[in-house]
């Protein structure tokens, strides 16, 4: 017989604080408890509908909380909202806020997150916010429906486990999509805002705080932390949320289209090769492994190998500083809003030997994927405020970074393996002070100034007839002035030495970590790379069986292996 332990209600806030010398930042959680839905009611449509509304509320609030990180200086390191079980209890559910605080302004972090939540409770959400949240919910249901035949065994098993243990309804993707469409039409802004006022109750509250324990840092008392919450909830200065209207298109003026110079079969695997007027080679491989998914990669040689070593501190912010700044006329926040309801992800990257843009979309949003790729290539947006807040957050994280023994171990391992090479050195406060935003933007623009020699690979459920005009409009139009580049042979390699390094660090829970690195000379071929992967898998199984299972000598054993296809 399963025993369900009751969780009592409380009038006064419960404050629970824990300090740990290995905790890097101050993490706070505010939970507003309410009765759990009885198991017998979870099979009703009303339960699924309530869950749909709660998901809309937390999605809209989390969007607002994420925007707090764009303020300079940012009042928080991170923030999000959720609903569900209260910690591990089955008899209580809760609306929960989770946020990382600034050590030097914990009160300000509390006020920012709880204040934004209180503003939503008092004044509700806007029609445009609800429209975006509904669009995202519908898009997710449509994606699950399209991929219903590709669900993993684990996904099906976990759904059965949740049904058995918690009476969660067993809904098929068809059921979920039909209900989402129905709720999309039924649920009004008034209903959502009324539900938000009930969910964000400011009652039956529990505050949890996990903080570093270190010299020079004093956490406010439990009473002070409680007052931070109550004062933020009682503040009368909040105003209704407002936002500027969004444009209707990502690109105001479409670029001048290029052309397709040639098109022909390539190899023996159903690949089509197209050469565009700017020289970019495009390889298209139609597949039906996923019902509605197209993956794209656009890349050229060069990467960080062509950037001077003196810029190594800036490398850590490529491409995050670009993504944080947005593209074209859109800040990162407004770009996310613009993409509501679309199944598309696009991100630039600058690796050691290549730079490029990767993306994924469904067939409906294929044009959006190409538009974003074009913008990241030609119109990265400078946003000094977003970068300053990013630096501020990174600095706050670095102050206590070495409190975690695993982090210090990994840093030491990297420094030893690569001989303290600047290009692989971990980020520190000293290195952070050398980071220059203008130089980061300059490096990025240099890497994407010329598309000569770039290649594109498209794999998925793609129709080449609908693909051609998009290639002409957004890929053949990329600038190509004839600059031919390859990567430089200056990348750090693991030292070929026979050394043993032992170091100790005081830990709350003592444990030992052992890493053994082997290097060997082996020419890269697809066959040898596959053989190495097979060896890695076999050794992982063998070591786990012998070292962990039979001898109980380790928590776990991992084996990694890699061949460098560009090694010279």
Regions found by a protein language model. Give the residues of each.
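Proteolytic maturation boundary segments
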Residues: 1-72, 131-135, 142, 162-308, ...
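M16 family metallopeptidases and their MPP-like homologs
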Residues: 24-45, 65-186, 204-212, 283-285, ...
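Flexible, low-complexity linker/tail segments at the boundary of structured domains
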Residues: 448-449
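Short Ser/Thr-interspersed hydrophobic loop/turn segments at strand-loop and sheet-helix junctions
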Residues: 539-543
């Amino acid at each position: 017989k399963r025993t369900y332990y009751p969780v009592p209600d409380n009038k006064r806030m419960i404050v629970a604080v824990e300090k740990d010398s290995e905790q890097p930042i101050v993490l706070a959680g505010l939970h507003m408890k309410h009765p759990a839905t009885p198991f017998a009611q979870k099979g009703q449509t009303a339960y699924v509908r309530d869950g749909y509304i709660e998901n809309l509320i937390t999605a809209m609030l989390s969007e607002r909380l994420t925007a707090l990180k764009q303020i300079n200086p940012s009042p928080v390191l991170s923030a999000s909202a959720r609903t569900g079980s209260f910690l591990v209890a089955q008899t209580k559910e809760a609306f929960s806020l989770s946020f990382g605080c600034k050590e030097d302004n914990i009160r300000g972090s509390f006020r920012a997150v709880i204040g934004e939540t209180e503003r939503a409770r008092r004044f509700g959400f806007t029609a445009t916010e609800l429209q975006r949240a509904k669009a995202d919910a519908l898009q997710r249901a449509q994606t699950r429906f399209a991929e219903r035949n590709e669900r993993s065994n684990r996904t099906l098993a976990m759904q059965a486990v949740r049904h058995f243990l918690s009476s969660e309804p067993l809904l098929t993707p068809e059921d979920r999509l039909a209900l989402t469409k129905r709720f999309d039409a039924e649920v009004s802004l008034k209903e959502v805002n009324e539900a938000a006022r009930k969910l964000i109750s400011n009652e039956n509250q529990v505050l949890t705080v996990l903080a570093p324990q270190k010299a020079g840092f004093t956490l406010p008392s439990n009473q002070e932390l409680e007052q931070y919450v109550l004062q933020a909830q009682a503040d009368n200065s909040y105003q209704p949320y407002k936002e500027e209207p969004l444009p209707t298109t990502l690109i105001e003026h479409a670029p001048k289209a290029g052309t397709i110079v040639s098109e022909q079969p390539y190899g023996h695997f159903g690949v089509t090769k197209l050469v565009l007027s700017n020289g970019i080679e495009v390889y298209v491989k139609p597949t039906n492994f996923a019902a509605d998914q197209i993956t794209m990669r656009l890349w050229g040689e060069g990467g960080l190998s062509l950037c001077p070593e003196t810029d190594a501190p800036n490398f850590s912010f490529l491409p995050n500083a670009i993504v944080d700044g947005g593209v074209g006329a859109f800040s990162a926040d407004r770009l996310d809003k613009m993409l509501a309801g679309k199944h598309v992800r696009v991100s630039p990257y600058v690796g050691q030997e290549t730079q490029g843009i990767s993306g994924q979309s469904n067939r409906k949003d294929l044009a959006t994927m190409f538009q974003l790729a074009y913008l990241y290539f030609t119109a990265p947006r400078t946003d000094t405020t977003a970068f300053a807040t990013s630096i501020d957050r990174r600095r706050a994280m670095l102050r206590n970074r070495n409190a975690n023994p695993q982090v210090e171990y990994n840093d030491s391992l990297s420094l030893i393996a690569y001989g303290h090479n600047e290009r692989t050195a971990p980020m520190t406060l000293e290195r952070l002070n050398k980071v220059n935003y203008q130089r980061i933007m300059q490096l990025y623009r240099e890497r994407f100034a010329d598309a000569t020699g770039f290649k594109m690979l498209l794999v998925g459920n793609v129709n080449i007839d609908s693909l051609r005009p998009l290639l002409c409009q957004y890929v053949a139009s990329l600038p190509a002035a004839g600059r031919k580049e390859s990567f430089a042979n200056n990348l750090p390699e693991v030292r070929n030495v026979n050394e043993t390094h032992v170091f100790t660090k005081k830990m709350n829970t003592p444990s030992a970590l052992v890493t053994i690195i082997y290097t060997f000379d082996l020419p890269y071929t697809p066959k040898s790379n596959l053989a190495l992967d097979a060896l890695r898998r076999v050794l992982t199984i063998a070591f786990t069986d012998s070292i962990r299972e039979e001898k109980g000598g380790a928590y776990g054993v991992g084996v990694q292996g890699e061949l460098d296809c560009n090694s010279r």
